Amino acid sequence: MRPVSDFDRIASNIAIWHGYDSAVKAELYSTCLGTSGGNYLIDPIPLESEALSELVGSKSVAGIIVTNCNHHRASAEFAEKFSAPLFGRTEAFPNKAEPDLKRVADGDKIYDELTAIDIEGAVEGEIALNYAPDDGTFIIGDALINFEPYGFTFLPAKYCSNGKQMRRSLRKLLAFKAKRMLFSHGTPILSDASERLRSLLDGSL
């Protein structure tokens, strides 16, 4: 897909960028988290060089995080460009061994207050992330979406390996507090994210 020309900063240390990929006929969203240990790029799609330089700024890129087996996108290119390791579940890389892959498991801390949560029953290798600073932020792979005509809801059942199991797994997120929720597919939720998630999960019982 073509490189995106710009990004949106939604907090001092959080930015997103997005673009349409005709190959999958979907709008794809990517996230940059700025930590004291460097930037983490999550499910990155291509970004024009000038915008990328502005996004990264003076900080190093500490890692590229892949949230499931379908979200490799430009991760390999970014990892090579910045000499940064890839982070993800082993199941997210089923077809090849990545020499610089740092495997993550449920509850692992990728960095300080950045935690990975396994989401079983969604797409193979699915994780969600919780970034605790500034009232908390969830970053979701495919298990939750927020775009029309669906709105904020679960990944449609036809794309899940086990929808009921996915809903149970998503309840693990309720152990964390998050003001914001960012998606790989959909518009960010910028307030009351934990409450919105609880309402969605309770309504699915």
Question: Model-flagged regions — what are they?
Answer:
Residues 1-5, 21-38, 89-98:
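An N-terminal domain-start capping segment
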Residues 26, 48-51, 71, 122, ...:
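Amphipathic coiled-coil/heptad-repeat helices and related helical stalk/stem segments
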Residues 2, 6-8, 12-16, 21-23, 77-80, 84-125, 133-134, 161, ...:
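Metallo-beta-lactamase
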Residues 19, 23-63:
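Pre-active-site segment of Zn-dependent metallo-hydrolases
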Residues 48-49, 69-74, 93-96, 145-147, ...:
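Active-site environment of divalent metal-dependent phosphoester hydrolases
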Residues 48-89:
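Active-site metal-binding motif and surrounding structural segment of the metallo-beta-lactamase
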